[in-house]
């Protein structure tokens, strides 16, 4: 059911070959993160308020109110995965290796993550990019 909802949400992603590739990549990351969360010790949760979390919840609400985004279950899993990646792991929403056609891939060098589309997406309403720890890839002109 989750996979079906993701395919329906991704119907506007073209070309089809890219849609298939990115969905495989994102499902792999989603599954891996859910398994990591299941093994997480509650003692490892931050006790102090998390900077950016209120904005994160606003973005989730924007998605929930978007009539084109019609899968509450997919939104739940995507939001949990994104929050876990950003706030607990310090990782980008899109895992390293995620390809954006004609632009490049999310990559990691030492302790820094680079995204080829960060600057393009930061101002887009409802985008987790504003909270993502990845930096704009300096090798990609936005």
Swiss-Prot record:
It comes from the Archaea. Pfam families: DUF2115. InterPro entries: DUF2115. Belongs to the UPF0305 family. This is UPF0305 protein MK0666.
């Amino acid at each position: 059911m989750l996979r079906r909802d993701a395919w329906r949400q991704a119907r506007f992603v073209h070309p089809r070959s890219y849609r298939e590739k990115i969905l495989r990549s994102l499902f792999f990351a989603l599954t891996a993160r859910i398994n990591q969360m299941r093994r997480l010790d509650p003692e490892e949760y931050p006790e102090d308020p998390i900077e950016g979390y209120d904005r994160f919840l606003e973005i989730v609400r924007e998605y929930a109110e978007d009539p084109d985004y019609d899968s509450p279950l997919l939104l739940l899993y995507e939001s949990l995965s994104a929050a876990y990646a950003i706030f607990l792991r310090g990782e980008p929403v899109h895992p390293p290796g995620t390809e954006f056609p004609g632009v490049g891939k999310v990559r990691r060098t030492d302790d820094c993550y680079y995204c080829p589309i960060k600057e393009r997406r930061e101002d887009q309403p409802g985008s987790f990019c504003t909270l993502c720890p990845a930096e704009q890839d300096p090798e990609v002109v936005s």
